[in-house]
């Protein structure tokens, strides 16, 4: 083996050793940044698994290079504003089987355009801010939540790129129209535009108007009856006074007859 071959062999060995060392450092760095109660691995990008970890809130010390994040089967109740804003490489986010009730307006700011899969199924979500899913390009799963079907939900689903697939399994637990309760959202939306419904205030205005007219009619009837009673009383008194006046007028004739 000549010197050139020996040098190349040693150089290659050093490169492989250096590469292994760098990978070890990266793995150690990722492990050291792994949130408490979670498991982190570097298979195909940094995977952070926090499933069944009894978490009551989303960890705030998530590694910025996280690609897959599993937070399912915990006790998380809300998704705060900008909680994922530093996770620019995040592709998969699983928040299913929690107790999520509230999603803030800017909860997915920073990851809305890069996220590919979002799982919010099996939670307690009834409604969200109309801008909560703005620019979200992910395939979202939001089934098995007690959704209240109204104009806001209609706007939310329309703002999502994959809205038809997302809305397909949404069932209205309650609705602005009682007849839609228990029905799929798509059926309810096809039957009526939930953002163009007659306002109930119109019915109240009509009721107030009718009550006003009814009060006026009753008042007029009462006044009319009382007025007639008063006129009848006066007329009766007048009639009662007539005989006495007639008698006084006849008295001189009786006297002259006697004379």
Curated annotation (Swiss-Prot):
Its main location: membrane. Belongs to the LRRC3 family. The chain crosses the membrane at residues 205-225. It is a single-pass membrane protein. SMART domains: LRR_TYP, LRRNT. Disulfide bonds: none annotated. Residues 145-197 form the LRRCT domain. Residues 34-64 form the LRRNT domain. This is Leucine-rich repeat-containing protein 3B. The gene is LRRC3B. Pfam families: LRR_1, LRR_8, LRRNT. InterPro entries: Leu-rich_rpt (IPR001611), Leu-rich_rpt_typical-subtyp (IPR003591), LRR_dom_sf (IPR032675), LRRNT (IPR000372). Residues 1-33 form the signal peptide.
């Amino acid at each position: 083996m000549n010197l050139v071959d020996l040098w190349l062999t040693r150089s290659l060995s050093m490169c492989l050793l250096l590469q292994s060392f760098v990978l070890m450092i990266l793995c150690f760095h990722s492990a050291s940044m792994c949130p408490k109660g979670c498991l982190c691995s570097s298979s195909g990008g940094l995977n952070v698994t926090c499933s069944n970890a009894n978490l009551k809130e989303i960890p705030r010390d998530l590694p910025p290079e996280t690609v897959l994040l599993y937070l399912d089967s915990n006790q998380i109740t809300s998704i705060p504003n900008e909680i994922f804003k530093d996770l620019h490489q995040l592709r998969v986010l699983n928040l299913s089987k929690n107790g999520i009730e509230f999603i803030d307006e800017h909860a997915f700011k920073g990851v809305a355009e890069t996220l590919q899969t979002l799982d919010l199924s099996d939670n307690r979500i009834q409604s969200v801010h109309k801008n909560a899913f703005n620019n979200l390009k992910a395939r979202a799963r939001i089934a098995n939540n007690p959704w209240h079907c109204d104009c806001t939900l209609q706007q939310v689903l329309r703002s999502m790129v994959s809205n038809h697939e997302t809305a397909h399994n949404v069932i209205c637990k309650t609705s602005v129209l009682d007849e839609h309760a228990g029905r799929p959202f798509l059926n309810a939306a096809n039957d009526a535009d939930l953002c163009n419904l007659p306002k109930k205030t119109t019915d109240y205005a009509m009721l107030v108007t009718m009550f006003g007219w009814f009060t006026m009619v009753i008042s007029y009837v009462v006044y009319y009856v009382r007025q007639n009673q008063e006129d009848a009383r006066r007329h009766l008194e007048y009639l009662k006074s007539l005989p006495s006046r007639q008698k006084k007028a006849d008295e001189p004739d009786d006297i002259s007859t006697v004379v």
